[in-house]
Amino acid sequence: MKRILAILLMLTMILSAAFAEGNPGAEDAQAGSPEVVRYDYDELVVGTAMPMYGAFSMDNWGNSTSDVDVRKLIHGYNLIEWNSAVSGFQLDPSVVTLGSLVTRDDAGNHVYSLTLYDDMYYSDGTKITAWDYAFSWLLRTSPLISEIGGATRQADYLAGWSDYAAGNTPYLAGVQVTGEYSLKITISAEYLPFFYEVSLLDCYPYPIQAIAPGCEVADDGNGVYIRNKENPDGGALFTADLLKNTLLNGTNGYLSHPEVVSGAYRLVSFDGAEARFELNPYYKGNSDGLKPVIPRIVFKTANNETMVDDLLQGKYGLLNKVSRADVIQDAMMRAISEGAYMADAYPRPGLSFITFNGGKSATADPEVRKAIALCLDKEALKDDYVGEFGVKSDGFYGLGQWMYQMVSGTISQEPDEGMTEAEKEQFQKDWDEVTLEGQETYEFNTGRANEILDAAGWTLNKAGEAYDSSKDDVRCKKIGEELVPLELKLIYPETTEIGEALDIWFAAPLKEAGILLTIETSPSVLPIYYGQDNTDYDMLYLATNFDVAFDPTQMFMEGGSVNVHGVKDAELVKLAGEMRQTEQGDLLTYCTKWISFLKRFTEVEPMIPVYSNVYYDFHPEVLQNYKITQYISWADAIVGSYFSDVAEEPAEAAE
């Protein structure tokens, strides 16, 4: 597994170069190519195969990749940002002034005293102040969110949040407003150390006038709270009923149709498949001093079967996160070889996986889950969908995660300059011992699956007699008074178009182990995953891209806000907690704990990792300064991009 990512990326570069230089038949293809497409330089149309669900303002209702992209486009001035140059989080220097500092109080809490710039505005011209950030924390972590179908954000890292979430106090002690443009954020000592500590300050401002009209944020010295703006002794206006209307209204609710925003663009319309945006004239720019140039953006769901044709016809100016092997190859052959288009490849910080319903008798059994995992031909399924642009996954990680890259040898940590030769040698030895080798991989083996099921007592047929594979279709087991058959249902998102491959490489092998699998598609799988839909299922086929601040505890803890019906495991939660409670900068210790977490993951097998892959973005050469590999999202990269007929000057020449 050593350097597998480097090899994969090298392969993609070789393929890109080969298609750019030409290939057999390329001249004929070019001869028949349509005339040069003329783009509307005032509008960029972005296409992706990943659907939008409309959670454009908060992650309390889901975190789909496309929704995250929209959030980054329309919400700005987060207190923190990811600095790719140092591979770490930092306070955003365009939002927080240099006079801000962090101290430790007598209780061991970390207190961040932040001073904000006074030149930030919402898209309607309203000034953004410290009160807007305070409202954001109060809203996202409020117990009212769960009353209207969302997941209250767990903020146990904030001092006093547990009392606020439980309704014991109306105020949030860990957030204080000390001036119109100054905040104090207190991180609880119980949560420290935290490897991604600065990421805990993740917060966009939200306009209280749009979400909670008639309310205001106050702070009497104990922490921030929400009260009536007028008639403070009257009935509280900040209620679940109010938020249900202002957040979830299908026409103008702030969750899916926010009008007043703080980002580079503002949302003009959204119909479920297409979102339109225009420049926010009040946006002052990002920390690099860049302001958006392209006046309008259209973001829409693209069809894998037609997206390359649409790119060549000028219907798209950017295809984002292209995954399917045949689509990538088609784009390379017909777009890149033509010479007027560009391709950017970057490793995915996530994976596709199959999650189990831990509330079902069959899939609650870890031995059943292991047997099911052995019946999935990951390599074949991967080849069918992402081909040479991906690798099968044997753990809960993605190719783009820094931990995977370090442990697999793609990148390395240099020893400190002051180390002696002996210390350097020991340092390297310690890193060599941190490896993915030896982890259970559940290689495709239906024979072993049958052995596991036999040993686990799944040895009866539907008549309650001994199971005989030569004449019985389904294994059963007596659990209590119920005879439970291994008749299972898997649901996958209709946009993935992977149903046929699942039939061949998963459902068919499962039959050999006495498991009958029904495969169904759904346009809304994520609401099931987040517990917002009561659809019956045994397994879900999903994909995720991890946050840079990797913290999987919510996935596996009782009462977690994601994977609500999934398998829970206290030991996994414990190991995830130990992983995050690592001193900042101690990469070796963090990766060592990460390996322990992955080992337990394979012992429990709460999910079946399937594959991780390299994403491709395709765009015409006239879209310039689009540097997706330096950012987390296309929405960040597009701020510095522009259309121009003048060829982009190479970086070396520019210097």
Give short role names for the model-derived ranges.
Residues 98-153, 178, 184, 310, ...:
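Aromatic- and charge-enriched surface segment that lines or borders ligand/interaction sites
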Residues 150-240, 411-419:
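Surface-exposed binding/hinge segments that line
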Residues 46, 125, 311, 317, ...:
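Periplasmic binding protein-like
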Residues 250-256, 273-276, 282-331, 516:
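Ligand-site clamp/hinge motif
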Residues 364-507, 596:
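Append "and occasionally in soluble cytosolic enzymes with long acidic Gly/Pro-rich linkers
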Residues 44-107:
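N-terminal lobe/hinge region of extracytoplasmic solute-binding protein
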Residues 199-292, 296, 446, 450-452:
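Gly/Pro-rich hinge or "lid" segments in bacterial periplasmic/extracellular proteins
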Residues 274, 375-424, 498, 502-507, ...:
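Detector for C-terminal structural segments
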